[in-house]
Amino acid sequence: MLAKLLTKIFGSRNDRTLCRMSKAVDAINQMEPAMEQLSDEQLAAKTVEFRDCIAQGATVDSLLPEAFAVVREASKRVFGMRHFDVQLMGGMVLNDRCIAEMRTGEGKTLTATLPAYLNALSGKGVHVVTVNDYLAQRDAENNRPLFEFLGLSVGINLPGLPAPAKRAAYAADITYGTNNEYGFDYLRDNMAFSPEERVQRKLHYALVDEVDSILIDEARTPLIISGPAEDSSDMYRRVDKLIPHLIRQDKEDSESFQGEGHFSVDEKSRQVNLTERGLMLIEELLVKAGIMEEGESLYSPANIMLMHHVTAALRAHVLFARDVDYIVKDGEVIIVDEHTGRTMPGRRWSDGLHQAVEAKENVAIQNENQTLASITFQNYFRLYEKLAGMTGTADTEAFEFSSIYKLDTIVVPTNRPMIRKDLADLVYMTEKEKIDAIIEDIKTCTERGQPVLVGTISIEKSELVSGELEKAGIAHKVLNAKFHAMEADIVAQAGQPGAVTIATNMAGRGTDIVLGGSWQAEVAALESPDEQQIAAIKDAWQPRHEAVLAAGGLHIIGTERHESRRIDNQLRGRSGRQGDAGSSRFYLSMEDALMRIFASDRVSGMMRKLGMKPGEAIEHPWVTKAIANAQRKVESRNFDIRKQLLEYDDVANDQRCAIYTQRNELLDVADISETVKSIREDVLKTILDSYIPPQSLEEMWDVQGLEHRLKDDFDLDMPVAQWLDDEPGLHEEILRERVLEQMLAQYQRKEEIVGSDIMRNFEKGVMLQTLDSLWKEHLAAMDYLRQGIHLRGYAQKDPKQEYKRESFAMFAAMLESLKYEVISMLSKVQVRMPEEVEAMEQQRREEAERLARQQQLSHQAPVEELTQGSAAAAQEGRKVGRNDPCPCGSGKKFKHCHGKLQ
């Protein structure tokens, strides 16, 4: 109550911020006449002037009013578009490390040019982040003339570009690209083997378009660079055949309930749990299939990977549906983004889930992958010195932006008042009744020439509505993941009189729906149109535009509520842009996922009390409130999941930063011999301490063990026992120094043979390779730890604290292993004189020829075939270890057989 009273007196924080900014807007407007007097050359020269000011110590913020006035004037001359006052405010919000909520059609792309120009003046680079490649390319090309007029360079960071092109894109003053590509480039840079391979500069300023989609919807999806692991595709197929024998039951077994089914599904948490009966059946089926031994348990440690396969197969069949979560195209399973409805080629689910879905759909199963490097968007974007974002819908997630990213959300007013009518939800008992009502609404709209945009939550639902429209004889276009390439064209013309467009979720975000259709799109479709053709297209568009306005503008139909209110608002926001007329309505049924899982009891109780008849809809504030509460519950749950994910990932992030910092220091230093020397002393001290404890009696020394360890791990023949026999009074400290001297002397001899330059490069290469290999293993170990850590809660321990403690111990152990393995490898490496190398090569060739003759004489497969076979095996991911049996069937180890030929 008090808070409301104070807000009434002093205004909200948002109002006070806008009031402060309006003074800066007045200052910019006062500069406009002076800017108009400048010639093009004088206006462009302002950039050099600003850069000189920054070089002399001026801050970017102190230049804001004049810099914004320069961009506004340049935009008038280049595009014929003048930034509105509210767009200037939006630019200030973005410069202040905040999120600007600007409604659809308010010109976010043009607004972004203001802070992008201002922050590019420092010369540290600006990254404009978009949700897909099409928008990155479109925005870069659209804004390039403006920035180049002002003397700034523009780069586009697209997937698949060669390293020199990427480096050039990042070296530009302003770089456009997708969130995925920026993140992957960061990971790739931290896997580089020379400074020249890196493409990114220091991360300075990120300006994120559709910030809610990237920082919230995709926050739970880590970016992973992976390499192939062992092949287990056959096991996925064998286990997949067993799943159809299992029967679902409604709820989980408990003391009071024992079901007849084999598994239960928790739709809220998207988990599948085997019942006791199900476990017995699956064990029986696994034994019959010859996958498991009689009498074994699926939960025994030996069958941990088998349990992993069963769980993945069960989830693939029960939780993941074709044309909802994924599509099958050209024999490949492609994930559909649940938030945008777009396909994500190249993305794969982890933990064997993707392979299980491939087995279910009977397509080629690709190898499981092992993580080489990963980062979440939450942690990647927090690496920037300065972060800001813009979207049409951020206010509902303001708390999350503030608590996780330290970004305040400012709602920027619209240039013209919004007059869209948001009609109350209509709730039906069944899905069929709801679809029938939607078709009737569409018919009514098309009869009066009003365009309709129908929003669905999955491909399956969009095709269901499409099928019903076909039956009713209503012409329409479908925009979903299957027709991804036509997205922008379909959306651009969705405002034509009487047009009906079905869109999955918010596919097509970033493209405005113009009432009457886009005349610019019609012009773009023509090959080099002349002035007369353009004028004719504009003249034809004007009456269409007025007819649509008279019919009520664009009508939005939501076929069901999304889990998040924000995504519903995004759908509504496609209508009523720039003060245009428009309307929206959501149609719901008691069979919708959200209603069934979160709101069914309360709402169905209300419907029964109101005496609902088939085909009748309920339209009541109570129902709308119950649905909003259900959505808040889901949003709160999803926020908790993201927050928890971040808390766990922060532990890994600290370690990631430490490893990447160390790795970059290694790359940037030409000579790491001092580091190697220091590590060698540490390693040797640890080994000597374990066999010759400090200040201990000679009887406690394990001299024989020390000799074996030095020989096996460091290829050092140290007659320690002989030294002690020859010098009975040899002191422990002198012994330690002698071992170190011998080790250094052996290493020095190798360096004399190959030269110091080669040895320095070799040291760096060994250090980087070992670091990468151990980091990869550490990531896998962290994954396993993370998956089971929640069980510590049963022992009255805090899983997060346990995870921090254990992961730190694992990290410390990894760093010790790094030291040990680097020194071991450097000590064991054999160096040869050039003539020795040539003699060994000749011997190897003769041995290969002898083996080939032997095999032909004994009627075995020719060598070429066998080597091709092993190469094919390698291509398929079946890497043959040097100590594994040779694939030729000789019974010998690979290194003693065909491994000799490689």
From Swiss-Prot:
GO terms for biological process: intracellular protein transmembrane transport; protein import; protein targeting; protein transport by the Sec complex. Keywords: ATP-binding, Cell inner membrane, Cell membrane, Cytoplasm, Membrane, Metal-binding, Nucleotide-binding, Protein transport, Translocase, Translocation, Transport, Zinc. Residues 892-902 have a biased composition (Basic residues). GO terms for cellular component: cell envelope Sec protein transport complex; cytosol; plasma membrane. Its main location: membrane. Residues 851-902 are annotated as: Disordered. InterPro entries: Helicase_ATP-bd, P-loop_NTPase, SEC_C_motif, SecA, SecA_CS, SecA_DEAD, SecA_motor_DEAD, SecA_preprotein_X-link_dom. It is found in: Cell inner membrane; Cytoplasm. Its EC number is 7.4.2.8. It catalyses: ATP + H2O + cellular proteinSide 1 = ADP + phosphate + cellular proteinSide 2. ATP binds at residues 87, 105-109, 512. The keyword ATP-binding applies. Part of the Sec protein translocase complex. Interacts with the SecYEG preprotein conducting channel. Has a central role in coupling the hydrolysis of ATP to the transfer of proteins into and across the cell membrane, serving both as a receptor for the preprotein-SecB complex and as an ATP-driven molecular motor driving the stepwise translocation of polypeptide chains across the membrane. Monomer and homodimer. Part of the essential Sec protein translocation apparatus which comprises SecA, SecYEG and auxiliary proteins SecDF-YajC and YidC. This is Protein translocase subunit SecA. It comes from Sodalis glossinidius (strain morsitans).
